[in-house]
Amino acid sequence: MNLFPAIDLRGGKVVRLTQGDYDRMTVYGEDPCAQARQFVEAGARYLHVVDLDGAKDGTLSNYRSIAALAEQGGLYIEVGGGIRTEERIEKYLSLDVDRCILGSVAVTDFDFTARMLKRYGERIAVGVDAKDGFVAIHGWKEVSAEKGVDFCRRLADAGCTA
């Protein structure tokens, strides 16, 4: 089993939202790299990073923080949050981020997701949230008509392994 400690970024800070509510945010630190070093010192080899600003409004306001995390090395880094275009995927992969995570776009544009899975293979993962067994998107604000299990089968058929 591989454990991925997580860093959620908002405005360049390490934060956690309460039940996904941007109005109920706790700041845990000003320096994401310092947090990552603490994870490494505790034995971590992997890191899950979520760009909450990107997820909410599609901006790249945390790009410098993510670049700094990738530059310090020592961790396998996966990034999610607001990745909706191939340009964004390329931008993150060019930083030596190891994997990009697609979220809501996997549901809203499955053809795009299938193309990215084919083009980038294991460098693409898909995050699937489910509520009452059905796929939830856009920060749990919408629930699709598709069951999570069925959606995951379609993803596997499209080549998704993570």
Protein language model features and the residues they cover:
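N-terminal amphipathic alpha-helix/helix-capping segment at the start of soluble metabolic enzymes
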Residues: 1-19, 131
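Hydrophobic faces of well-ordered beta-strands that scaffold small-molecule active sites
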Residues: 3-9, 47-49, 75-81, 100-102, ...
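Active-site-proximal loop/turn and secondary-structure-junction residues that shape catalytic pockets
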Residues: 9-11, 51-54, 83-85, 106, ...
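Conserved anion-binding
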Residues: 19-23, 90-93, 97-162
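Short, acidic/polar
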Residues: 28-40, 84-90, 143-155
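Catalytic domains of carbohydrate-active enzymes, especially glycoside hydrolases
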Residues: 35-50, 95, 157-162
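Glycine-rich, proline-tolerant flexible connector loops at the mouths of alpha/beta enzymes
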Residues: 46-64, 104
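Alpha-helix-loop-beta-strand connector modules within alpha/beta enzyme cores
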Residues: 57-80, 113-129
